[in-house]
Swiss-Prot record:
The keyword NAD does not apply. One of its GO terms (molecular function) is 3-deoxy-8-phosphooctulonate synthase activity. InterPro entries: Aldolase_TIM, DAHP1/KDSA, KDO8P_synthase. It is found in: Cytoplasm. This is 2-dehydro-3-deoxyphosphooctonate aldolase. Belongs to the KdsA family. Keywords: Cytoplasm, Lipopolysaccharide biosynthesis, Transferase. Disulfide bonds: none annotated. GO terms for cellular component: cytoplasm. Pathway: Carbohydrate biosynthesis; 3-deoxy-D-manno-octulosonate biosynthesis; 3-deoxy-D-manno-octulosonate from D-ribulose 5-phosphate: step 2/3; Bacterial outer membrane biogenesis; lipopolysaccharide biosynthesis. It catalyses: D-arabinose 5-phosphate + phosphoenolpyruvate + H2O = 3-deoxy-alpha-D-manno-2-octulosonate-8-phosphate + phosphate.
């Protein structure tokens, strides 16, 4: 098995390369907050020498309640993304939920994300593939790791092989997720880059009746465990005031802890990737 390298400007995304950080905020709450968070991430990752892609959503279409905040929408969201990209010279990733969003979003961002709940929607997969953008596929909570090959095949047959696979936890009874570390290793056998969404793996879906709960206190332990697998990247969201974030605050890393947090993740990644491979199957 060879590791596929996805090129993004000067960034190389691959399981055997230094990890890439996909991070930012869950949903765009305001232009000013997005700029503040992007600036913090850019400064910290530049200081630590970590390749970085800014992430935020313009619409959270799958909230628990119809009254929950969803975001500014695509038109306003893309304006904010363009300003972040030009101001900080950052590549961008965001998610799409409908076929008509794919082409205009791909004109602004570098990576478009297929949400976990929509990962089997063929029309959406084909529309995303046709943009020729890099695709980040969130593994559905209800799929086994080996079933990701079907989604990969759909993208390939639609003409796109610039694929990243993202683990975000698996359903474990009601209102709970667990992370199968061996499952991430199984996805790595595809050769495609695998990244770990340590933020949403902390969720307790529906745990607060009308919104998801989370286990922010375990953010460090979970991410360190994932990084020990030798992954292509880490997906982490942060907020200056997680308790008052408009979406997934219980899972968000406090923004002021970002540098200390990433320092540990980089140390784990550097150490693991310095080891020689051991084939224990023989």
């Amino acid at each position: 098995m060879s590791n596929k390298i996805i090129g993004l400007g000067s960034i190389e995304i691959a399981n055997d390369k230094p990890f890439v950080l996909f991070g930012g905020m869950n949903v765009l709450e305001s232009r000013d907050l997005a700029m503040k968070i992007a600036e913090t991430y850019a400064e910290v990752t530049q200081k630590l020498g970590i390749p970085y892609v800014f992430k935020a959503s313009f619409d959270k279409a799958n909230r628990s309640s119809v009254n929950s905040y969803r975001g500014p929408g695509m038109e306003e969201g893309l304006k904010i993304f363009e300003e972040i990209k030009s101001t900080f010279n950052l590549p961008l990733i965001t998610d799409v939920h409908e076929v008509h969003q794919c082409a205009p979003v791909a004109e602004v961002v570098d990576i478009i994300q297929l949400p976990a709940f929509l990962a089997r929607q063929t029309d959406l997969v084909v529309a995303m593939a046709k943009t020729d953008a890099i695709i980040n596929v969130k593994k559905p909570q209800f799929l086994a790791p080996h079933e990701m090959r079907h989604i990969i095949t759909k993208f390939n047959e639609a003409g796109n092989d610039k694929i990243i696979l993202c683990e975000r936890g698996s359903s474990f009874g009601y209102n709970n997720l667990v992370v199968d570390m061996l499952g991430m290793d199984e996805m790595k056998q595809s050769g495609y880059p695998v990244i770990f969404d340590a933020t949403h793996a902390l969720q307790r879906p529906g745990g607060r009746s009308d919104s998801a709960g989370g286990r922010r206190a375990q953010a460090t332990e979970l991410a360190r465990s994932g990084m020990a697998l030798g992954l292509a990247g880490l997906f982490i969201e942060a907020h200056p005031d997680p308790d008052n974030a408009k979406c997934d605050g219980p899972c968000a890393l406090p923004l002021h802890q970002l540098e200390a947090y990433l320092t540990q993740m980089k140390a784990v990644d550097d150490l693991v990737k310095s080891f020689d491979a051991i084939d224990t199957s023989k």
